[in-house]
Structure formats: C-alpha cells, structure tokens
From Swiss-Prot:
Disulfide bonds: none annotated. It holds the Pfam family RRF. This is Ribosome-recycling factor. The keyword Cytoplasm applies. InterPro entries: Ribosome_recyc_fac (IPR002661), Ribosome_recyc_fac_dom (IPR023584), RRF_sf (IPR036191).
Length: 185
C-alpha cells in the first residue's frame, strides 16, 4: 500500500519536473531554439493548433528561427499568433516562410528572464510539496484506519520526504543551469 503511494507520488513529481523543463526550454536565452514556440498556439480553421503541427520549425543560424508552414495559407495566422504571444518577437513574413530573429539580450532583459525562471522554479517546488502533502495524507489515512502501524506510517512519510528532497534538489539544479545559460554572454 505504501509502495503504491510512493510510486504514484514519484510519478507525479516526475511529471512536474518534465513540465518545468518544457517551460524553461521555451524561454529565450539569446539563442534560437525551436522549443521557444512550443507554447504558441495558432487559430487555424477554428481550433487552437500548436505551431509545430502546422509547420517545420528549424534554427538555421544561432539567432534565427525559420518557420516553414506546410500550408502557405496559414502564414498570416502563424504570424498573428507569434505577435500575440508573450515572446516579444517580430516575425518577418516573406510569403513562403517566417523568419524570427532573436535579439541580443540586454543585461536588464537577462535579469527579467532570470526572475521568470526563478518564479517557474518556485511554482514547480510548490507542486512537488503539494504532491508530498497528498502522499502523507494518504499514509495518515491508512494509519487512522489501522491498515498500517505507527512505524510503517513514519517510515512511509520519511520515504515521501526523501523523494520530495530529491526532486526539490533537481529543480534547484535545473533552475540554476538555466540561470547560468541566460546570464552567460
């Protein structure tokens, strides 16, 4: 029973880590990265569609993203979605492809990005702690119903805490690596 709780808690924590990595991967750090556009959805034939399902996104140069839509009619929609996103990029549409030039980051912009990175990291830690609380509550319920002993409950809570500590440390490492990436000129 406790093993199931631990496995489910760890599985949820892993999902939180992958969401963190995806969110941080989509943040610009002065280099073009196709993942930057992962969270941009295009209004296409009445439904919200991710750009990577409408076009090939590549990075031919370190600071350029090239978007080649499979349907040329979607160029305007893609351009509009990029302009409305919070990326702060200006698309250049030549009628067949869209080019995004990633501007050099100023010191101030870098610091703003680092603040966002820390905020996203903190949100991930909150999610991990919430999963810990959920796991501990389930263990306490098992003890309350006399399904497990006091010692098993304490051991289970200790195991949940160890898993939590492991993923909090991983979040700290991911966030500090992203900060270094953003601050390196």
């Amino acid at each position: 029973m406790i093993k199931d709780i631990l496995n489910k808690s760890e599985e949820k924590m892993l999902k939180s880590i992958s969401v963190l990595k995806k969110d941080l991967g989509s943040m610009k750090a002065g280099k073009a990265n196709p993942a930057m556009l992962d969270r941009v959805n295009v209004e296409y034939y009445g439904s919200e569609t991710p750009i990577n399902q409408l076009a090939n996104v590549s990075s031919p140069e370190p600071r350029v993203l090239l978007i080649q839509p499979w349907d040329k009619n979607s160029l305007k929609d893609i351009e509009k979605a990029i302009l409305q996103s919070d990326l702060g990029l200006n698309p250049s549409n030549d009628g067949s492809v869209i080019r995004l030039i990633i501007p050099e980051l100023t010191e101030e912009t870098r610091k703003d990005i680092v603040k966002k990175v820390k905020k996203i990291g903190e949100e991930s830690k909150i999610a991990i702690r919430s999963i810990r609380r959920e796991g501990n509550d389930k263990i306490k319920n098992l003890k309350k119903n006399n399904d497990i002993t006091e010692d098993e409950a304490k051991e289970g809570e200790s195991s949940v805490q160890k898993i939590t500590d492991k993923y909090i440390t991983e979040i700290d490492n991911i966030v500090s690596a992203k900060e270094k990436e953003v601050m390196s000129v």
